[in-house]
């Protein structure tokens, strides 16, 4: 029978037995035939699935519950469709009957015919004519007249007792369900009789992989009216089961009248006799089994007795051979123990071998891991070495670039020093010309009388005072520079750590350019020029001192390497400005204002030199603070008693003002000036000293 289907609309269901959830639902089937065209092209076919989808598309408002193909030929395809309600059958027929379908790839149209499904159910005329025409039927006897219904395809689970937990159908449930139509005389479910298969030689139940799902049953009514009502109620119906959760399931059942006299008295007696025979046969088989079992037991008892006799005989023999058997037993135990020991030793040896293999495997894995780690470490070290090599190459490239840049700077510095040297030589030439001019001026004058000599001496002293100031400034800077060690180098081993406070007290030191020794004669000449004795003339005192104070520019420095001639550009320019500015200003200004301006310029140069220091520690500069040089700049000009009164008073007032200003600021200015001068002299190179003396 067909499988159960889900029912969504249960409005047309009729109650059969609500206690067990059984209802009757009308069968709403229809047959649909689609005429196929003649296939003219070979290899071309019509898809049944496409035709089915076109039929479903023709009914837009509703859907088929089921639509399946019942028959398919070259001329037509027949479908069986089922809908939810009986009322929908006519609307479906109106949508399908007489319509056409156009398939893709075919020029011909397909005509559709639809009609209501004809139910195969026996009518009253069928069973009346059957029982009337049958010769072996007696309508006066139950079972041989139309009073028995034959049901097929009933689900076992729907007719099983709920409290029993079994899925086998129950005759009591079957009676309660079908006694609605009338009093039931007898029922029969063949699958419940274990002897029925042996009696009839056929199977009365439907088999499936899930077990006994469906069964057949016979229901016999006492009255003919009960049979008529049952057949009328089951016509065109299918059985529906509604569970406790409200879900409904329906299945088709086959209903017919019994034409085999299954529940007639003769058939029942016949089945009972056959059952009795089968039971007797079964009893005989059981009796035969019991007798065979008893015979086997007797045989076993006799065998036991025989064995006992034999055992007694063996016991006698055993007593005779007890000593041998004991010996054999001991030997056997010894061999058994030996075998067990050998077996245990073999097992232990096997376990030991397995452990050794396992340890070797672990060792091999550890070695592989170690090799992997070493390989990774080697690869990483190589990668690191490559990285370091690349970094070193970059650093080497950068260093070469820096060296190239430094070389270019040094070349530029050398070019600048050469230019400075050329300029210094030019200045030396100018200085030599000036000296020659001064010498010619001094030598061209002849002394006439003492008064004229005094006037000329005063005039010459006034004229040469700026030149003497310049020479004293240059000589004092050179003396302070010679007391310090060279720039960037260490002082000589025999040099004292602290420079003397009074250079004139020491011997004549050897400077870099060899001209520092002339400082003492120069100072003596200055002192002689400042204090004029009564018996000496100015011409005899001043010219010789002036000429002795002028250094010789032809002396060249010895033993100074060319690498120490590099000085900073700003210091060189400041010295050049000093050389360019001081002579002109010294000639034009002999007053105290010019001297103060000169001191200010010296202090500004000392500050610039101290700012350019190379970060020398303060502790290295501290010892130089204790020794301050005396200011060698001239503070007084030599005067003559025969000079004019106005000039003498003017000069005295000017010198008095200068001395008062110098006394007020000498304590602080002298210490800072000498410290800056010593630091500036340390920062200068020997080439700087040489260029200063050359200027």
Curated annotation (Swiss-Prot):
Record PTM Phosphoserine, positions in chain: 537, 633
Spans annotated as Disordered: 279-337, 482-695
Domain of life: Eukaryota
GO biological process assignments: B cell activation; mRNA processing; regulation of DNA-templated transcription; regulation of RNA splicing; RNA splicing; signal transduction
Ranges of biased composition (kind: Basic and acidic residues): 567-585, 629-644
Cited Pfam families: RBD_AKAP-17A
Subcellular location: Nucleus speckle
Region called PKA-RI and PKA-RII subunit binding domain, residue ranges: 83-112
Residue(s) of cross-link: Glycyl lysine isopeptide (Lys-Gly) (interchain with G-Cter in SUMO2): 118
Region (PKA-RI-alpha subunit binding domain) location: 425-454
RRM domain mapped to chain residues: 147-256
Positions bearing the Glycyl lysine isopeptide (Lys-Gly) (interchain with G-Cter in SUMO1) cross-link: 118
Residue stretches of biased makeup (Basic residues): 598-609, 618-628, 645-658, 666-695
Alphabetic keyword roster: Isopeptide bond, mRNA processing, mRNA splicing, Nucleus, Phosphoprotein, RNA-binding, Spliceosome, Ubl conjugation
Tissues expressing this chain: Widely expressed. Found in heart, brain, lung, liver, skeletal muscle, kidney and pancreas. Expressed in activated B-cells and placenta. Expressed in all cell lines tested including Jurkat-TAg, U-937 and HEK293 cells.
Keyword Zinc: no
Single GO MF annotation: RNA binding
Gene Ontology terms: cellular component: cytosol; nuclear speck; nucleus; spliceosomal complex
Ubl conjugation is among the record's keywords: yes
Oligomer status and interactors: Monomer. Component of the spliceosome. Interacts with ZRANB2 and SFRS1/ASF through its Arg/Ser-rich domain. Interacts with RI and RII subunits of PKA.
More about this protein: The gene coding for this protein is located in the pseudoautosomal region 1 (PAR1) of X and Y chromosomes.
Domain notes: RI-alpha binding site, predicted to form an amphipathic helix, could participate in protein-protein interactions with a complementary surface on the R-subunit dimer.
Protein function: Splice factor regulating alternative splice site selection for certain mRNA precursors. Mediates regulation of pre-mRNA splicing in a PKA-dependent manner.
Protein name: A-kinase anchor protein 17A
Lineage: Eukaryota, Metazoa, Chordata, Craniata, Vertebrata
């Amino acid at each position: 029978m067909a499988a159960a289907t889900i029912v969504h609309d249960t409005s047309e269901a009729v109650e059969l037995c609500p206690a067990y959830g059984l209802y009757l639902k009308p069968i709403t089937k229809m047959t649909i035939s689609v005429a196929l065209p003649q296939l003219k092209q070979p290899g071309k076919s019509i898809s049944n699935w496409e035709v089915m989808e076109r039929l479903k598309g023709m009914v837009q408002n509703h859907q088929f519950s089921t639509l399946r193909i019942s028959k398919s030929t070259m001329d037509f395809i027949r479908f069986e469709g089922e809908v939810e309600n009986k009322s929908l059958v006519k609307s479906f027929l109106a949508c399908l009957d007489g319509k056409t379908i156009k398939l893709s790839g075919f020029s011909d149209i397909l005509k559709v015919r639809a009609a209501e499904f004809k139910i195969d159910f026996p009518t009253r005329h069928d069973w009346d004519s059957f029982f009337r025409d049958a010769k072996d039927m007696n309508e006066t006897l139950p079972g041989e007249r139309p009073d028995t219904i034959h049901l097929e395809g009933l689900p076992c689970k729907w007719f099983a007792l709920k409290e029993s937990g079994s899925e086998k159908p129950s005759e009591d449930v079957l009676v309660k369900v079908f006694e609605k139509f009338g009093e039931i005389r007898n029922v029969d479910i063949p699958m419940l009789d274990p002897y029925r298969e042996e009696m009839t030689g056929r199977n009365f139940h439907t088999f499936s992989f899930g077990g006994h799902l469906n069964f057949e049953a016979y229901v016999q009514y006492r009255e003919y009216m009960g049979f008529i009502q049952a057949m009328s109620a089951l016509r065109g119906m299918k059985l529906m089961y509604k569970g406790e959760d409200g879900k409904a399931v329906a299945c088709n059942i086959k209903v017919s009248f019994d034409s085999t006299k299954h529940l007639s008295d003769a058939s029942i007696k016949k089945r009972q006799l056959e059952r009795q025979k089968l039971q007797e046969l079964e009893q005989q088989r059981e009796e035969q089994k019991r007798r065979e079992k008893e015979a086997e037991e007797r045989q076993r008892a006799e065998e036991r007795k025989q064995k006992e006799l034999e055992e007694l005989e063996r016991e006698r023999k055993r007593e005779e051979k007890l000593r041998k058997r004991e010996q054999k037993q001991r030997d056997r135990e010894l061999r058994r123990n030996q075998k067990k020991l050998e077996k245990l030793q073999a097992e232990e040896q096997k376990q030991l071998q397995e452990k050794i293999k396992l340890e070797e495997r672990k060792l091999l894995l550890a070695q592989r891991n170690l090799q992997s780690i070493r390989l990774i470490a080697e690869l990483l070290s190589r990668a690191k070495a490559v990285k370091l090599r690349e970094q070193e190459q970059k650093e080497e490239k950068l260093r070469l670039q820096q060296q190239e840049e430094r070389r270019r700077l040094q070349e530029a510095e050398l070019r600048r020093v050469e230019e400075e040297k050329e300029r210094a030589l030019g200045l030396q030439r100018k200085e030599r010309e000036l000296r020659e001019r001064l010498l010619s001026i001094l030598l061209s004058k002849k002394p006439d009388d003492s008064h004229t000599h005094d006037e000329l001496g005063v005039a010459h002293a006034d004229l040469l005072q700026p030149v003497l100031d310049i020479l004293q400034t240059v000589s004092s800077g050179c003396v302070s520079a010679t007391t310090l060690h060279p720039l960037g180098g260490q002082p000589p081993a025999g040099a004292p750590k602290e420079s003397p406070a009074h250079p004139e007290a020491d011997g004549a030191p050897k400077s870099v350019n060899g001209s520092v020794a002339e400082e003492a004669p120069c100072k003596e000449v200055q002192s002689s020029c400042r204090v004029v004795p009564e018996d000496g003339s100015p011409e005899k005192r001043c010219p010789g001192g002036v000429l002795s104070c002028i250094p010789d520019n032809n002396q060249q420095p010895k033993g100074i390497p060319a690498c120490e001639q590099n000085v900073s550009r700003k210091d060189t320019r400041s010295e050049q400005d000093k050389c360019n500015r001081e002579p002109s200003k010294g000639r034009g200004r002999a007053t105290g204002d010019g001297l103060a301006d000169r001191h200010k310029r010296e202090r500004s140069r000392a500050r610039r030199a101290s700012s350019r220091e190379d970060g020398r520690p303060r502790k290295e500069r501290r010892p130089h603070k204790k020794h301050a040089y005396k200011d060698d700049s001239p503070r007084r000009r030599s005067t003559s008693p025969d000079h004019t009164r106005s000039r003498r008073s003017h000069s005295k007032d000017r010198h008095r003002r200068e001395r008062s200003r110098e006394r007020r600021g000498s304590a602080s200015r002298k210490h800072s000036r000498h410290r800056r001068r010593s630091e500036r002299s340390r920062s200068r190179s020997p080439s700087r000293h040489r260029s200063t003396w050359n200027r």
